[in-house]
Amino acid sequence: MLAKRIIPCLDVRNGQVVKGVQFRNHEIIGDIVPLAQRYAQEGADELVFYDITASSDGRVVDKSWVSRVAEVIDIPFCVAGGIKSVEEAGQILSFGADKISINSPALADPELITRLADRYGVQCIVVGIDTWHDAATGRYHVNQYTGDETRTKVTTWETLDWVEEVQKRGAGEIVLNMMNQDGVRNGYDLHQLNLVRDVCNVPLIASGGAGTMEHFLDAFQTAHVDGALAASVFHKQIINIGELKQYLKQQGVEIRVC
């Protein structure tokens, strides 16, 4: 069995790490490189960096900090933000990123997933899905341009359909960003994760809602995800990654402990 992964998420805006609640009202957390170093030293399995306004601003992720991160950490990291071409992805990988993630650009051009997978291999291609639960209808819908709350829009895709579509097109991994849970720290949406797990045959990463060590355990044992991504509990030092991994190991989760 492959070890489960603990993945800190660093949302980047204007060269700094920020964090919001339900993708809104972002506050500055700190500088990119020191935070990346800290998480690597604490025992993170990999890092994810989202340049959250790149797509809504119509630009690609700022590459200047990608190479600086690559110089100071020795764990894999994934970069996302406005990547719309094979060439842009190649630049980010050449700067030292191990994976690239696409979200809004994939919704605008689904064939982009295939072009990237064909060029760089599915192991490098992550698709992020920003999913919102509509309580009135009980449905889960995919949102686009979520980095800018003035431009965020609900797409015509229902979440499960889009999960199946991106796999057909070559996604090597899926990060499910559950917007209702984002930043509120009351647990991952296990019901939604189980629905997605049933149709997801590639590694699935849960994102949005972690507030306690038990929430990570629930995601692994109840929803059988491959990795758990979190931000505010790590940024605010509510949970230490090393202590979290020791706890998970004690609970029988297969995980790498430093």
UniProtKB/Swiss-Prot annotation:
Originating organism: Pectobacterium atrosepticum (strain SCRI 1043 / ATCC BAA-672) (Erwinia carotovora subsp. atroseptica)
Keywords: Amino-acid biosynthesis, Cytoplasm, Histidine biosynthesis, Lyase
Superkingdom assignment: Bacteria
Family annotation (HAMAP family): HisF
InterPro entries referenced in this protein's UniProt entry, alphabetically: Aldolase_TIM, His_biosynth, HisF, IGPS_HisA/HisF, RibuloseP-bd_barrel
Subcellular location: Cytoplasm
Protein name: Imidazole glycerol phosphate synthase subunit HisF
GO-annotated molecular function: imidazoleglycerol-phosphate synthase activity; lyase activity
Described function: IGPS catalyzes the conversion of PRFAR and glutamine to IGP, AICAR and glutamate. The HisF subunit catalyzes the cyclization activity that produces IGP and AICAR from PRFAR using the ammonia provided by the HisH subunit.
